[in-house]
Amino acid sequence: MPHPKAIFLTGATGFLGSHLTARFLVEGRQVKVLARSSKDLSARHRVEATLQDVGITEFENLTVVEGDISLDGLGLSADIRNDLASSVEEVWHCAASLSFQDENRAEIFRMNVDGTRHVVDLVKIVPGHRLHHVSTAYIAGKRSDVALENEIDVGQTFRNPYEESKCRAELIISEAHRAGAVTASIYRPSIVIGDSRSGRVTHFHGVYAFIRALWTVLERMRRRASETRNASPRETQGPRGAAMGGTRSLNNGRVHLPLRVLGMDNQTLNFVPIDYVVDGMLEISRRKDSIGSTYHLTNPVPTKNGFWLPNICRILGVEGIRLVGESSFVMTPTSKLEALFQKQMAFYYQYLQGEPRFDCRRVLEALKNTGIQCPRVTVEFISKMMGWYVDFLASQAGRAGLEL
């Protein structure tokens, strides 16, 4: 039976938003998405290119509306806003700035806080429209206790403007819902990674940026080692033949990379695969009792840093990387390589020293008897994720002739 009205979605070019859009299109839904054009590509071209990466080839049911969440009225004319309000039955707000730097604070708040307010204003035009807001579990900030699904602002401090802005956005949604202006549900995924069945991922934030940085350094070292073996003695005496900060190739084909990473082995990161997040959100969204509730799409069994990092290093063929406390850098100064990593990975290092424990009882109850379960992060799971991504990096480097 065809659905009478369409879905309106923001953030269709993002990781989660593109997968949600793809699922709706596969289900035969009419989907209208808000997107910006770029310097070189139209809004529609950007959306279609992103959806093709997710496996979508038919766009008959897709309408792309050019606009911007950071602008009043989403940058749309009154006629277009009224048409959207009358032609859609659900609004999924996935768009967000993922930046975290303090110097970008104004832009982050413009996108994440003002943008949410502008989406709420659209939904208010026709009361009763269902608003689904995608937030993050990390609005819990620097808390180290159990973060409950019904909590928003409990006086916590934040690691960065991104977390704070997403918390502020939730407060806007919550206030509008309590006032009866919108009918809303909020979803808080944790660290979203690739598909649990294939390992495939289409956006490369978070832990993938860390892996890419490591992989690039290792490939550069292996290439230089190969060149050195084939070079004359005179050619190996200069900087090109020198080792990088104590790095060396081992007889077993692995690389020793003396790299200290600020973090704690016994702390965790909460990884959730994209398919679980999408399946879970859609299942929950169809439950009438989900109206007015917030859900942690998090892993009930978070992964210890002392488990995932060594397994990633094993697959990459590197030894010598270890998590240390701040005192280690007091006793032994930071190396050039460590300084480089700290600069590139500043955002992600914030999370290696501890995170809250996310209570997800609402999600577990809602998904009970549905067959939707979050997989545990095992050695096999990590191998699948890493295998796909390493193959992807190698193929991209080969096609682009990447200078390592």
Where are these regions (language model features)?
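Glycine/proline-rich active-site loop of Rossmann-fold NAD(P)-dependent oxidoreductases
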Residues: D195-V207, R223, I284-Y295
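N-terminal Rossmann/SDR dinucleotide-binding element
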Residues: M1-S97, V126
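Amphipathic terminal alpha-helices
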Residues: A6, F15, R23, K32-A35, ...
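Mid/C-terminal beta-alpha module of Rossmann-like enzyme folds, strongest
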Residues: G280-F347, Y389, L393-L404
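A hydrophobic C-terminal alpha-helical subdomain
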Residues: V217-R224, G238-M264, S328-Q373
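A conserved pocket-lining segment of Rossmann-fold NAD(P)-dependent short-chain dehydrogenase/reductase
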Residues: D102, V154, S198-G199, V207-V272, ...
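Active-site Tyr-X1-5-Lys
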Residues: T157-S190, D195
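Conserved Rossmann-fold NAD(P)-dependent oxidoreductase catalytic core, especially the SDR/UDP-sugar
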Residues: E90-A95, Q101-A106, R110, D114-P161, ...
